C-alpha cells in the first residue's frame, strides 16, 4: 500500500512538474548567471527526477548539472544547511561565497546555517529582514540589482 501511495504521489508531482511555469524573471536571471560562468544548484523538497523535469519544462535544464540538483533523496530538507554544504564541498567553494535564492524562510534559514548569503525573491514585502541579505520583488529585479539584467 505504501508503494502504491508513493507511486501515485510521484505521478501527481510529475504532472505538476511538466506543467510548471517559471517565476517572473527567473529564466532570464538563470541564463544570465549561467552565461557569466556561475555554478548553479537547486535544493528542493521535490524528488530529484521531478526537479529535472521542472527545469526542462521552464527551459533552463541545460544550465544545471544533474548532480547539482539536490532533491529530497539527496540532502536533508531545508532549513538544514546540508544541501548547501554538499554543493559547497562539491564545488570546492566556501559557503560564504555562495548565494541562496529562495522565496521562503526555510531558504533563508538554510543560507544562514551554512554561512552563505541569502536573497529573498517573489515577495513584495520582506517578513524576515534579519535573515535576508538581498530582497527583490522578483528574479528580474534581483538580476538588475546584481547588474546582470537591464
PLM region spans:
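Metal-dependent phosphoesterase signature
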Residues: 1-28
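Short, surface-exposed loop/turn motifs that are enriched in glycine and acidic residues
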Residues: 16, 40-41, 73-77
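Glycine/serine-rich loop-strand microenvironments at binding/catalytic pocket rims
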Residues: 20-42
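Asp-based, Mg2+/Mn2+-dependent phosphohydrolase catalytic module
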Residues: 27, 31-35, 48, 52-150
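Conserved phosphate-coupling serine/threonine residues in phosphotransfer and NTP-handling enzymes
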Residues: 44-46
